[in-house]
From Swiss-Prot:
Mg(2+) binds at T26. GTP hydrolase that promotes the GTP-dependent binding of aminoacyl-tRNA to the A-site of ribosomes during protein biosynthesis. It is found in: Cytoplasm. Residues 10-206 form the tr-type G domain. Monomer. The lineage of its organism: Bacteria, Bacillati, Actinomycetota, Actinomycetes, Frankiales. It catalyses: GTP + H2O = GDP + phosphate + H(+). HAMAP family: EF_Tu_B (MF_00118_B). GO terms for molecular function: GTP binding; GTPase activity; translation elongation factor activity. Residues 62-66 are annotated as: G2. Belongs to the TRAFAC class translation factor GTPase superfamily. Classic translation factor GTPase family. EF-Tu/EF-1A subfamily. This is Elongation factor Tu.
């Protein structure tokens, strides 16, 4: 089958289905592809349920996660949609950011209302930066009583408010994924209504290229007669020749320098941008002034820190993680971007220990500063082996 050309003309948005087990996330994902296929057959292939359900495994920060990816288009947009088969896969995906979501469809069964995993997913969405939610009140064909539907809707809105989402304004669309998947026309219309709500309520993300310049340093070389070159992949923003940049992290002080050259594939460029693997020639910098693990950034856009609060997922032993719990003052390595830094863990009040397979909050104090901001992701390692993954929730100092 010929690969279809990726159309750059439409805005691209990443979304996913979240919610309690058996509330119909995967059925809804399949039904969306069916209804959009019927509405725009030239744009959308239909992806059947069983194809989404046997999601392939992928690795993110050393953690194996099952994630199904489907794509589809509405009139307005191109979507990449992720769906995970298991509850643990969701937690791992949301914490590691394996598949980043610009927004989510929260699936709640009208017959059950919000359940424990509904709450856990909403809390995680709030913490790990899934900024927007649209609600699909699923299995609405199985509830005849209008009052019950209204009560469930109210409960979902209250839950969203509890976790600081705008629960009163979030669109709640009553759907029946199964009926729509079976080809029922009226329920198919409701799914088009759901996607119209997603189009309208989940804004386009800010593109990486529009954010302040940042490049993690992977390697440092000296080129005789020209100076010091640092290489890496530009994470965000643009860097132009002759711009002033800062070198942040690892060392106690931040260094300012000028980029005198940008090279890619041995060619000189005027600028490098997000996604490019480049070498940057730095003025007046000695080989020993810079090292892997530091970042080159737009001045004043990010600062070095050592103490932070984080949300982490700890691998269980079947995933290659620890076999035993850890306690406060645990001292693993924290792998940020390109390097490991040792840190000391403090557990939240009332938590004595963390078991393999748990997800928890913790405070960490690193022995060296790292260029850090809220949302930054990291792996937790012991001697090069990944035992967990996390995300910075709050920078303390």
């Amino acid at each position: 089958m010929a690969k279809q050309k990726f159309e750059r003309t439409k805005p691209h948005v990443n979304i996913g289905t979240i919610g309690h087990i058996d509330h119909g996330k995967t059925t809804l994902t399949a039904a969306i592809t069916k209804v959009l296929h019927d509405a725009h057959p030239d744009l959308n292939p239909f992806t059947p349920f069983d194809q989404i359900d046997k999601a392939p495994e992928e690795k993110a920060r050393g953690i194996t996660i099952s994630i199904a990816h489907v794509e589809y288009q509405t009139d307005a947009r191109h979507y990449a949609h992720v769906d995970c088969p298991g509850h643990a896969d969701y937690i791992k995906n949301m914490i590691t950011g394996a598949a980043q979501m610009d927004g989510a469809i929260l699936v709640v069964s009208a017959t059950d209302g919000p359940m424990p995993q509904t709450k856990e997913h909403v809390l995680l969405a709030r913490q790990v930066g899934v900024p927007y939610i649209v609600v699909a009140l699923n299995k609405a064909d199985m509830v005849d009583d209008e009052e019950i539907l209204e009560l469930v809707e109210l409960e979902v809105r209250e839950l969203l408010n509890t976790y600081e989402f705008p629960g009163d304004d979030v669109p709640v669309i009553r759907v029946s994924a199964l009926k729509a998947l079976e080809g029922d026309k009226e329920w198919g219309e409701k799914l088009l209504e759901l996607m119209a709500a997603v189009d309208a309520s989940i804004p386009e993300p800010e593109r990486d290229i529009d954010r302040p310049f940042l490049m993690p340093i992977e390697d440092v070389f000296t080129i005789t007669g020209r100076g010091t070159v640092v290489t890496g992949r530009i994470e965000r923003g643009i860097v132009k020749v002759n711009e002033t940049v800062e070198i942040v992290g690892i060392k106690p002080e931040t260094t300012t320098t000028t980029v005198t050259g940008v090279e890619m594939f041995r060619k000189l460029l005027d600028e490098g941008q997000a996604g490019d693997n480049v070498g940057l020639l730095l003025r007046g910098i000695k080989r020993e002034d810079v090292e892997r693990g530091q970042v080159i950034v737009k001045p004043k856009s990010i600062t070095p820190h050592t103490v932070f609060e984080a949300r982490v997922y700890i691998l269980n032993k079947d995933e290659g993680g620890r076999h035993t719990p850890f306690f406060k003052n645990y001292r693993p390595q924290f792998y940020f971007r390109t390097t490991d830094v040792t840190g000391v863990v403090t557990l939240p009040e009332g938590t004595e220990m963390v078991m393999p397979g748990d997800n928890t909050e913790m405070t960490v104090e690193l022995i060296q500063p790292i260029a850090m901001e809220e949302g930054l992701r990291f792996a937790i390692r012991e001697g090069g082996r990944t035992v967990g993954a996390g995300q910075v929730l709050k920078v303390i100092k």
